[in-house]
């Protein structure tokens, strides 16, 4: 296919249009007086949201060069979301500011490589200062404040704080849709381990890329399954029950995996395969934990058991299993409460006895998974549109709170970024590197300016006043007052602010050093040719192979 190529100034200008289009759509959502964005959906009602990454992912531009610029900034939002789970709008605002300022200087003749070094130096200094002015998060009230700021809802803040109190800061918290109008917390017994599905074709929800099994059987073995004949007898018994099955094995590959995927796609049989968690002896112990939790049995040659002779009685059961690319969560296993309690006490005793810090940490992880349970936040709303929007906000709030527990908190509302300006000004740089530092200095003001703009105020006046105030004093756009942000409960997790800044700086530096952009040339008669009629699909749907 022929290509279109643009060079230097022309290329960067085209991409900048895309950057501005995406960033302008995202940044209207920033701050307590930020607005919403409505996204068209092919099916069902439109989605109304103020979640930066959700908006960024939806934007596709007709011009290929502009679209590449938009996708670069969407990558900033997506990466920040992956690392910190929140802060995507801030990251987008920072990236746009750095790119616009940088482009002015490159157009004036500055060396992009020198600017890049300056941006990297300034970002490193800003991150170091952010960590220096941060405070550890302490107590339920602080956790509730972080969650409330992220979701713009005090009730959500309290619910998330309670959930973390019930299952621990590292506990498993999932978010589901409720049939009622209110948002409630429910703690159910469950276990999560860090292994995902063996094939993406096993997913049942393509939007979230997760496989959800309701009321499944659980087959647990320490063997590698390569031939479907090994598990066919027990799978046929499961098929007769018309229930799905989760297969936990050392590995599922080759013909066995292909057959499971094929039958899943045909709708004949719903099975999801995952690798067993852990390694060596720890793997055997974790499989035993899962077996006790689900009321099943580990099919292992150590006990003289063979897959071919396994029956449905040796399988575990659960109310629900959710499998993502990286994790598997088993909810409400059907195990005997006495056996589960006995296993928990056994693990507690092992924690007391072991002298190895590593072993102690791993035992405590297993104990938390077995005894901690899973907190389920059931999101309710009057309409489906409101529910989706509320669910996205709660997901952001939960991620933000976890990030705060992990690395601490700083003043929110863009205040912390203004507070680090003094440290960035002290960076030793000359020439084009100094220009790069100045680009970051200007960008650090942008979140406060945008929050003020969304509240109908002049941002530059507020920024200058904040520079003269002591560290931690910021502008509360909700009330129009200058307050100590931490004491007022307007907080941002360090991890969120840091990730937003680092990702914005990274993409901006790459953008400014771009000298050529290559895109596919659009075909003149694309879609012009008529498609012939599709022949009928022969053959019925055979049963399991």
UniProtKB/Swiss-Prot annotation:
Q: Which compartment or compartments is the protein found in? A: Cytoplasm
For this UniProt record, give its keywords in alphabetical order, as a comma-separated list: ATP-binding, Chaperone, Cytoplasm, Isomerase, Nucleotide-binding
Q: Which terms in the Gene Ontology molecular function aspect does this entry carry?
A: ATP binding; ATP-dependent protein folding chaperone; isomerase activity; unfolded protein binding
Q: What is its main location?
A: cytoplasm
Q: Which Pfam families match?
A: Cpn60_TCP1 (PF00118)
| Residues in coiled coil | none
Binding-site list for ATP: 29-32, 86-90, 413, 476-478, 492
Gene Ontology biological process terms, A to Z: protein refolding
Record keyword Iron-sulfur present: no
Query: Which family is this protein grouped under?
Result: Belongs to the chaperonin (HSP60) family.
- Provide the protein name: Chaperonin GroEL
Q: What organism is recorded for this protein?
A: Shouchella clausii (strain KSM-K16) (Alkalihalobacillus clausii)
């Amino acid at each position: 296919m022929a290509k279109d190529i643009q060079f230097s100034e022309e290329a960067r200008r085209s991409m900048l249009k895309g950057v501005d289009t995406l960033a302008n759509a995202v940044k209207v959502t920033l701050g307590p007086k930020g607005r919403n964005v409505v996204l068209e959906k092919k099916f069902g009602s439109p989605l109304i949201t103020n979640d930066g990454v959700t908006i960024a992912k939806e934007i596709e531009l007709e011009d290929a060069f502009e679209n590449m610029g938009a996708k670069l900034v969407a990558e900033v939002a997506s990466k920040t979301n992956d690392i910190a789970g929140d802060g995507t709008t801030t990251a987008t605002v920072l990236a746009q500011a750095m790119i616009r300022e940088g482009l002015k200087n490159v157009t004036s003749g500055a060396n992009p490589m020198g600017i890049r070094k300056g941006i990297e130096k300034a970002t490193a200094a800003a991150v170091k200062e952010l960590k220096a002015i941060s405070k550890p998060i302490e107590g339920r009230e602080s956790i509730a404040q972080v969650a409330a700021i992220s979701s713009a809802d005090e009730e959500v803040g309290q619910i998330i704080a309670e959930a973390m109190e019930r299952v621990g800061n590292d506990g498993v918290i999932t978010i589901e849709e409720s049939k009622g109008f209110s948002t409630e917390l429910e703690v159910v017994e469950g276990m999560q381990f860090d292994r995902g599905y063996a094939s993406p074709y096993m997913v049942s929800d393509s939007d979230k890329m997760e496989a959800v099994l309701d009321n499944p059987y659980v087959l647990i073995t320490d063997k590698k399954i390569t031939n479907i004949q090994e598990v066919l007898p027990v799978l046929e018994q499961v098929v007769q029950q018309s229930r799905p099955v989760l297969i936990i094995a050392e590995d599922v590959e080759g013909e066995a995996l292909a057959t499971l995927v094929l039958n899943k796609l045909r709708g004949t049989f719903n099975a999801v395969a995952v690798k067993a968690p852990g390694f060596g002896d720890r793997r055997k112990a974790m499989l035993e934990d899962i077996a006790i939790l689900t009321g099943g049995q580990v099919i292992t040659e150590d006990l003289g058991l063979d897959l071919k002779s396994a029956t449905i009685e040796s399988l575990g059961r659960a109310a629900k299993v959710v499998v993502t690319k990286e994790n598997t969560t088993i909810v409400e296993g059907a195990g005997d409460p006495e056996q589960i309690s006995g296993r928990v006490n056994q693990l507690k005793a092992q924690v007391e006895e072991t002298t190895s810090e590593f072993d102690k940490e791993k035992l405590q992880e297993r104990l938390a998974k077995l005894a901690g349970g899973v907190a389920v936040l059931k999101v309710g709303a009057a309409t489906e549109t409101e529910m989706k929007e509320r669910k996205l906000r709660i997901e952001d709030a939960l991620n933000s709170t976890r990030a705060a527990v992990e690395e601490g908190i700083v003043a929110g509302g863009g205040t912390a970024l203004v507070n680090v300006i003094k440290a960035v000004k002290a960076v030793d740089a000359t020439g084009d590197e100094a220009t790069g530092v100045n680009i970051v200095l200007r960008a650090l003001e942008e979140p406060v300016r945008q929050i003020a703009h969304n509240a109908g105020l002049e941002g530059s006046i507020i920024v200058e006043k904040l520079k003269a105030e002591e560290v931690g004093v910021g502008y509360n756009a909700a009330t129009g007052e200058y307050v100590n942000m931490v004491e007022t409960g307007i907080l941002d997790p360090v991890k969120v602010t840091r990730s937003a800044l680092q990702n914005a700086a990274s993409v901006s530096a790459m953008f400014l050093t771009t000298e050529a952009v290559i895109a596919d040339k659009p075909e003149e008669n694309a879609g012009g040719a008529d498609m012939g009629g599709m022949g009928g699909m022969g053959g019925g749907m055979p049963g399991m192979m």
